[in-house]
Amino acid sequence: MTGVQTCALPIYQLRHVRFLKNKEGVLAHMAKHRRRLVPCFDAVKTAFTEKLTPCGNIAHWTNPKGGYFISLYVMPGCAKRVAALCKECGLTLTGAGSAYPYHKDPEDSHLRIAPTYPSLDEVETASDLLCVCVKLATVEKLLAEKA
């Protein structure tokens, strides 16, 4: 049986030490990240609150205190459809169910939202589009259940 070999590249460690220098350097660098990321996370949560909450119990989401993702839970059976609708509009999401083993969400209800890479303007636009797709997928599901 072979084991997993891990080996940090010393040159990368040296780069980090030279760049960050000490604990204060790490904290200062993380503060820069925070200043960039907090508005993006707030934009997503604001869009969800303003655009999804008035629609009733069609979605809920996490309010992370750190990390890179907001978990969005939509009506069961709708996550893949929401992701597909977003993709048709040019918005790429982390795959539906990606937080589950083998990407198999038994409820098909979870989307992992990562507002860390795009600009704030892009996050705001993407959040609005995502909300429209959640509403559309929900309406499609409800109409299919009534038929």
Predicted regions: what they are:
Residues M1, T6-A147:
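PLP-dependent class I/II
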